[in-house]
Structures are given as structure tokens and as C-alpha cells.
A protein has these predicted regions:
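Subset of outer-membrane beta-barrel
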Residues: 1-214
């Protein structure tokens, strides 16, 4: 949700790219549709990191049913001291349309304790498509993703306000050099179009190397 940092280390390391991340436990914060393209039936993770002398704690996970339906949830805090912490809860459902495309729905609730204190609610729609390619003995894939966030978002309390609505789209290419080694190249562009004061464009690019010994 608006105002609380994404706790996924992979997302931060990849330039803030969320729409085309591959399946992991933090899919609820990025793109829950991605979880349906992973090998694992379920994943759970927890983490913490410090940003600007403030600490974020988080926990998230998902579970797949029949490899076609996915339920995901996540919780995070953004800390000032032990008593003053912004908190959020995120829930998501994703459905796999076919071998290539999956869609997701998200709902977010956040409790802010800063100068603009109050409760924030919003919803989102996500999509991801994975197109596989054969390269001789090796496998590669093109991932395309999109995400509309902040739908119906508002912050109640003394400083009632609408939350930013943004659309993001990205692409990633997975290049599997062998069964153990892989490279991922990704890029994403995000446009915030409402309200006018928050309007703007931002983007990110990233590269990831993966080593699998299992």
C-alpha cells in the first residue's frame, strides 16, 4: 500500500520492479499472479531491514490449489519506535487462465501513525504472462506483467485524502544457461495518474543471477 516500503529484497535489488518478478513468498506485495508459475505449491518467508534508521518487519506467503488458484497474504510494519509503527495487511487471490496467462486481485489495509494518521484502504489488479522458448538444450522465457494499484484508495482520519492510483507494466527475460545457472534481465515503467499532485512517471531496470544446487 501507499507509504510503506516493499520488504522484498529481490524487488529492491532489481530496481523496484514488481510486475515481472518470478514466483516467491512475497508475491502478494509484487504480483500475486506470478505465484502460479512457480514450482512450489506453497512458500512462506519473513524478513526485516533498516531504511533511514527505521526498521521494516514483514511476513508473507502463498498457497496454490490445483495449480490454478492461489491465495496469498502478507503483513509488514514500518517503524519509528516500539509504539509508533505504520502497519499493513495485504490479501490476494490469483487465477490461472491458461498455460501462459494468470490474473490477480489484491486488497490492502494500512494503519498510519505519522502526521497524516488514519486508516488506508485500496485494491489492485495484476496480470502476468510467461512465454517459454527452447534454445537447443536450454530453456528461456519471456515474462510480461502489469499492475493497477490504489483502486478506490483513501486515507481516513483528520487529514482525509485520496491515495495515488498507478499503472505499471514490465518485461523480463529469463536465460537459463544450464540446470544450475540462470540470468534475468528486467525493466518496468510506472505511471501515477491520480491525483494530479502525485502525477508522474518512474521506472527501473535490473539484472539477476540465480544459482540452483537442488
Amino acid at each position: 500500500p501507499y507509504g510503506i516500503a516493499n520488504p522484498d529484497a529481490r524487488t529492491l535489488g532489481m530496481g523496484g520492479i514488481e510486475t515481472v518478478t518470478s514466483a516467491d513468498a512475497y508475491a502478494v506485495f509484487n504480483n500475486p499472479a506470478a505465484g502460479l508459475f512457480g514450482r512450489q505449491k506453497a512458500q512462506v518467508a519473513t524478513s526485516f531491514f533498516t531504511l533511514s534508521d527505521k526498521t521494516t518487519y514483514s511476513a508473507a506467503g502463498y498457497y496454490k490449489f490445483n495449480m490454478q488458484h492461489l491465495l496469498a497474504g502478507g503483513w509488514r510494519t514500518f517503524g519509528f519506535d516500539e509504539r509508533l509503527k505504520d502497519k499493513s495487511v495485504s490479501l490476494a487471490y490469483a487465477y490461472r487462465l491458461n498455460d501462459i496467462v494468470a490474473l490477480g486481485l489484491t486488497a490492502d489495509y494500512a494503519r498510519f501513525v505519522r502526521e497524516r494518521s488514519g486508516n488506508a484502504f485500496s485494491a489492485g489488479i495484476t496480470a502476468q504472462a510467461v512465454v517459454p522458448f527452447e534454445r537447443g538444450e536450454n530453456y528461456s522465457a519471456l515474462r510480461l506483467g502489469a499492475k493497477l494499484t490504489g483502486i478506490g484508495g483513501f486515507l481516513d482520519g483528520p487529514a482525509e485524502m485520496k491515495l495515488p492510483v498507478a499503472f505499471a507494466a514490465g518485461a523480463a527475460y529469463d536465460l537459463f544457461l544450464s540446470d544450475a545457472h540462470a540470468l534475468t534481465f528486467a525493466g518496468e515503467c510506472r505511471y501515477t495518474f491520480s491525483p494530479v499532485a502525485a502525477r508522474g512517471v518512474e521506472g527501473g531496470i535490473g539484472m539477476e543471477y540465480s544459482l540452483s544446487l537442488i
